[in-house]
Amino acid sequence: AVMGRNLALNIESRGYTVSIFNRSREKTEEVIAENPGKKLVPYYTVKEFVESLETPRRILLMVKAGAGTDAAIDSLKPYLDKGDIIIDGGNTFFQDTIRRNRELSAEGFNFIGTGVSGGEEGALKGPSIMPGGQKEAYELVAPILTKIAAVAEDGEPCVTYIGADGAGHYVKMVHNGIEYGDMQLIAEAYSLLKGGLNLSNEELAQTFTEWNNGELSSYLIDITKDIFTKKDEDGNYLVDVILDEAANKGTGKWTSQSALDLGEPLSLITESVFARYISSLKDQRVAASKVLSGPQAQPAGNKAEFIEKVRRALYLGKIVSYAQGFSQLRAASEEYNWDLNYGEIAKIFRAGCIIRAQFLQKITDAYAENPQIANLLLAPYFKQIADDYQQALRDVVAYAVQNGIPVPTFAAAVAYYDSYRAAVLPANLIQAQRDYFGAHTYKRI
């Protein structure tokens, strides 16, 4: 409801009159009461709401993904005309969007599955928008979407046509997977700085402030520095009194499931999903901590040196995560015939969304230089960072393993990097085993 309200207010603020409808009359009245003088026109029946719109109608749905979306579409259909456009701005599973696009197209309606990132504030002030569906229908809604989207530093709106049917929601799904990876990498960096150097929250805030002024400049690093200094009403640092169980809404899981379907090694993002799952086993972890032994953690040595190693490890880990995510976008584009433009996708992530970061311009540049590049790690800028920073990543992972500090995504980054650059892997033995017990055959060199 909040996302829908904020998007309506965003659209209204760009000079449009907006018809609004909610199943709950009270919620509709609440929005009107809280926003006097706005060009928001309330309707209390679906029929009146639909009939209030100019044709071709442009209807933005912001409902909970799943059965609720189908129910909302079914309630609209009796009053729609051929050529009307439904835009689904929810966190919808892309296969559902493909199905709805097919079904509605057969009935003469247009359906645009649209990823919207930026949370409640982004919805109000300007989100990153990822629309997928019929190109001609997109052209009819593009003027509105362009006006309400976030604007990058170079003045470009953070919206672009992604591709047919489920392409927009697929890109939003991978965006969310990358978000999981970013957050877990940052959490592991925090754990290392706390465990290895015993940094105070004030020192952590200072460290993240410095990081945010360099290569790691991003929304997530920016909010993390603020989190470290936040205190509760009793004067305690808030981060220290928050239970260590990270919840999830399932979009990270979808990204990993799709990777398995496509045969893509999305190891870092998948480890970030599993890290949330193991965090939720709090009671088991507390019990296990009293039974299972581990090494006694030793100090990490020189403070400035270790902080810099963790910074480098975090940046290279982030690059590996994005390399995996964009590699998966390439595989999905081929599988679903979407013809994705990876440079444009990186561009619209530069503002408005949760993963917005300075280094996204480097991804856009890499694809501008070579649109067919198989993996971002092969692009000159990222290859150079890998050359310069891999030792720091290896040192940090080695320290963590020796001292019993879990770093699943940092470790996944090293393993992926070394596997990807390996001309020969021990998979020949696995294939021999498969042939031995199952006559699966093998290829000779």
Swiss-Prot record:
The keyword NADP applies. Its EC number is 1.1.1.44. InterPro entries: 6-PGluconate_DH-like_C_sf, 6PGD_dom2, 6PGDH_C, 6PGDH_Gnd/GntZ, 6PGDH_NADP-bd, 6PGdom_BS, NAD(P)-bd_dom_sf, Pgluconate_DH. One of its GO terms (molecular function) is phosphogluconate dehydrogenase (decarboxylating) activity. The keyword Transit peptide does not apply. Keywords: Gluconate utilization, NADP, Oxidoreductase, Pentose shunt. Substrate binds at N91, S117, G118, G119, H175, N176, Y180, K249, R276, R434, H440. SUPFAM superfamilies: 6-phosphogluconate dehydrogenase C-terminal domain-like (SSF48179), NAD(P)-binding Rossmann-fold domains (SSF51735). It comes from the Bacteria. Disulfide bonds: none annotated. One of its GO terms (biological process) is pentose-phosphate shunt. NADP(+) binds at A1, V2, M3, G4, N22, R23, S24, V63, K64, A65, N91. The active site is at K172 (proton acceptor), E179 (proton donor). SMART domains: 6PGD. Pathway: Carbohydrate degradation; pentose phosphate pathway; D-ribulose 5-phosphate from D-glucose 6-phosphate (oxidative stage): step 3/3. It catalyses: 6-phospho-D-gluconate + NADP(+) = D-ribulose 5-phosphate + CO2 + NADPH. Belongs to the 6-phosphogluconate dehydrogenase family. Homodimer. Catalyzes the oxidative decarboxylation of 6-phosphogluconate to ribulose 5-phosphate and CO(2), with concomitant reduction of NADP to NADPH. This is 6-phosphogluconate dehydrogenase, decarboxylating.
